[in-house]
């Protein structure tokens, strides 16, 4: 009886604390928020001097953000569905409406809150964004007879502010199927091309500007200056965005979110994962445990280099896992690129989770995901951009994970990451290391991945990269690598007929990975590389050079 009375009193005490139930609320099954550290969460100091970019689905939206930031103004990409009230609360200095694949006269085309045009905030519309502005204010938008894509000559008719400091004509990049055929009342044309009369327009009283071309793309000459004019002459921004502030804000945010828990980071030795690891290590020190998974898909000498740099130089907790057999077993018989990526991503996470169980209080998985990683998989803001391919850092992961994600570089571009690496004190061999895909050499082998084919590719790639270094080109190009094709060709070596593999050389220039052009290498250099590969790598009798640009091709073959 005494026990029952005591139990009754305890239940009553709990009920007073939780009036709706005599039971303590269970935490089991509660969904934990995903942690994505980066500028969007660490931008308190920047919000009063920022530009909001409304994303209507353009593959170039992140390039707009990059152009703004390289002019030392903070930019945030938001959904086109953002309300005027939400924008008013953030009080940005200006708005940019991105391009997009839709047509403004389609019923299902994405639209923005019409209230944004009454806020008095300067607005720049690009391509679809320009057409949206024209339609809203009563102008007319029509479909072109033929889609205009590529370089066009832009003739500037007004140099007073938006085009201040530019010559009379420049090369611009066009990519559109619609055009503004007549301007709304109160708007004036600023520039034209031979086929587009209203290639740029303005309503200066409203501080609203629009361009049919893409100033954010490197193919537009002086495009960064056009963006700069909008930022400083129209929006009256101040130059305040720099990596020192980013480091301070992000380190503080990581400490706050992680607390006393531990973080596990998959370290590949590339600049992205390396910078992410060093940044997190600066925030939480020994609470970070890095894991290098030797999946058998890496280049020659990479494991040893990683040990030297991160154990020796940065004194990090670094574990090595030999999982070569697991990955090769998973890839046996697989030829589809998407299946390769997903299989490798899935196996990585399994390995990480197995290793993470050995670490006390681990709750977070760190990744070196960048802006281009996200846009190539799916729009970061849920906008209707077309999917290109599953990216190794985002799309290939299982939907259900036992660890929360920390992605401190998620909103940065590659050039910003390299600048960040310098300020964090990483060695030059990491800072200038060319991008290497998460699935490794598996997606540089067209067809099935086998130990024998991997070694052929490693040896050929080693020769090509070494010759690029000797020529003094390594730091000047974006990527240089070999691809092992799934075809064989007939050859003659000595007096015998051969039927062996083909290697493709790929060398591209780029500033961000979003667009790229093939490098015009010296034929003598190409000849030397070809001769060395054919003579030194067993199983190769032909070498070809890839002269495709992005777009329409991607940098990687798979």
Ranges and model annotations:
Residues 2-36, 40-94, 101-119, 131, ...:
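RNA-binding accessory domains that recognize and position tRNA/RNA substrates
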Residues 367-369:
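Extended catalytic-interface subdomain
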Residues 123-129:
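Conserved helicase ATPase motor motifs in RecA-like P-loop NTPase domains
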